[in-house]
Amino acid sequence: MDKKPLFHIGINYPRLYKYTKAEFADKMINEGTFRIGTMYEYRLTTAKEIGDPDEGTKGYSFLGTPEEQRSNIDVFFRSRPDLRRNHNASELEQSLADNIPIGFVEHCPDQYLYCTTHTFDETVMRHFECDACIEIINPRFFAESLSEAMRPYAPYGTMRECVYTNRWGDWDQQNNLPADIIKPLQLQHQKEVRLIWSSAREVFLGADLDPLEHKIVKSMQAARYCRRLI
């Protein structure tokens, strides 16, 4: 028997909403057809409400004396062994010796995304240039059903609410907010909740050189939990 896909839901929202085009809304409900995008797609999109060239990144600055910076950087890398393998140790030591401020930009690997919102707002929907909205009446069962359809492409999924904040900040061991749910402050009206599927790839100091392609999946089971709001 196949192992069921893993899907973690942090908050069980009573309802979620998907802004879309009318033609796609009909396909979701009538055919169970869903388009699952990717994080790196948003880096290439120029649409005001959608595109973000810094999607999936998070920056850290290391302050203090060279000894303090070296200690904090060591802690930083211990929790990110994949990053340690990708950085140039000699260049780092030279920067510390020259008293040059140290910073890293962390890139999460490309991931599959299905973006929704926990609060319906028709004005925001129009900002997305959408003319339809799907109400997801049971987000937990919807997410589990869609995750089943995504099983061939990604083994693990989670539902997370986006946090609208600055991507760059001083290093702090408690500053563990994942890069894949950070969005700029000017988009906080979106109130986005993401379904994220990961294929357990590494975190990078540069962009993922093997980006994913969007998927079209079928799930009439997921469609059962959708109804047309607009």
Tell me what each language-model feature is.
Residues M1-I230:
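NAD-dependent ADP-ribosyltransferases
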